[in-house]
Each structure stands twice: as C-alpha cells, then as structure tokens.
C-alpha cells in the first residue's frame, strides 16, 4: 500500500520523506492557498522535492478549460498527476487526457458508480472521500469495499486512492480492504507510529537500564 501526503507544505513533505513514509503527494486549491505566496512556485517546489506522483488540481468547469489547465500543470514536472473533478465534463477531460498519455486523479468521488465511470474513462487514480461520507452519517469505508469489488471484477487498472482520511483507523481499514493508496494529512500520519504500550515498554526498559548502570 502506498502512502501519499495530503499537503502543500514543504516542511511536512520533508519530514514525512525523512521517515520513509511518503510515496507521493496530493494537493488541492485549498491546501495551496493556505501556504500563501505564488501558488505556481509552491507547486513547482513540491514537484521538485517529491520523487513520486504529485496531484495538482484543475479548477475549470468545462472539459476544454480542464484540458488547457492540465497541459499547463503537466509542465511543472514529469511526476505531475492531474486532479479532475468527478463531473460529466471532468469525465470528458479524463478520457481526453488518457488518450494523450496524461495521468489523472478523479477526485470528489462519493459513490461506487462514480468510481466505475472514472475507471472507464481511463483515470489513473480515483479518490473516494471517506471522511466526508462519515461526516454525514454514511459508512465511508463501505464505499472503498464496493469500489475494490468492482475494480477486481473487471480488472480495472485504476488505483483506489483513499482521501479525506481523518484518523488512523481510516488508514488501517483502507489497508485491510486492499486500497492501493491512502493520502494522509501530516497530522494523521504522525500518529501512526504511536501506541501507549510502546511508550510504556520504553519507559520500563529505560528505568531498568538506569538501575543496571548505577
């Protein structure tokens, strides 16, 4: 299972990279706006820092606008993946970009049928948002199970990229179901190594070592 970092913050990217926990990065307009300054320079810096895929999102509403923006964003680096919204126009753009050999990440997916359409259009990744579904009293992880079943039934090469992850259990459930990628905020990825029994065990070992060396 791959871990992507859901951020536009270079410091977070470097920390996760140093831990060996980052296979790629996903961004969106909101994340880039939080960093301030020139978004183009920030996006280019991220592409230069990250060896794996970097998702950069188009904001146009028509397929023509999305394709035009995608061509610009693709110039930021060979590792750019174009984030496209799950709309009818987005599907047109996805299919066109697929024919041109441009990798895409269809985002804002909330149903298995949306994921199926994205896969048929040639999406490289599909991003179901589990946390947002949980937030409206739906089972976000059930969506991942349904998409996994559909993709396995028909051997779609499209990767399931679990998004809107809000806590470590989302990561665990994604791994158990067999999702290909989880894109994780740094605030969550920094919790994955923690366990109270690990802390308790270390404290006991250290206390015993101090006794031994006195």
Swiss-Prot record:
Task: Give the record's pathway.
Answer: Carbohydrate degradation; pentose phosphate pathway; D-glyceraldehyde 3-phosphate and beta-D-fructose 6-phosphate from D-ribose 5-phosphate and D-xylulose 5-phosphate (non-oxidative stage): step 2/3
Active site per UniProt? 83 (schiff-base intermediate with substrate)
Q: Which reaction does it catalyse?
A: D-sedoheptulose 7-phosphate + D-glyceraldehyde 3-phosphate = D-erythrose 4-phosphate + beta-D-fructose 6-phosphate
Q: Which GO terms describe its molecular function?
A: aldehyde-lyase activity; transaldolase activity
A GO biological process this protein is involved in? pentose-phosphate shunt
The alphabetical list of record keywords is: Cytoplasm, Pentose shunt, Schiff base, Transferase
Question: Which domain of life, per UniProt?
Answer: Bacteria
GO CC terms: cytoplasm
What does the UniProt function comment say about this protein? Transaldolase is important for the balance of metabolites in the pentose-phosphate pathway.
Which protein, by its recorded name, is this? Probable transaldolase
Origin species: Maridesulfovibrio salexigens (strain ATCC 14822 / DSM 2638 / NCIMB 8403 / VKM B-1763)
Q: Which gene encodes it?
A: tal
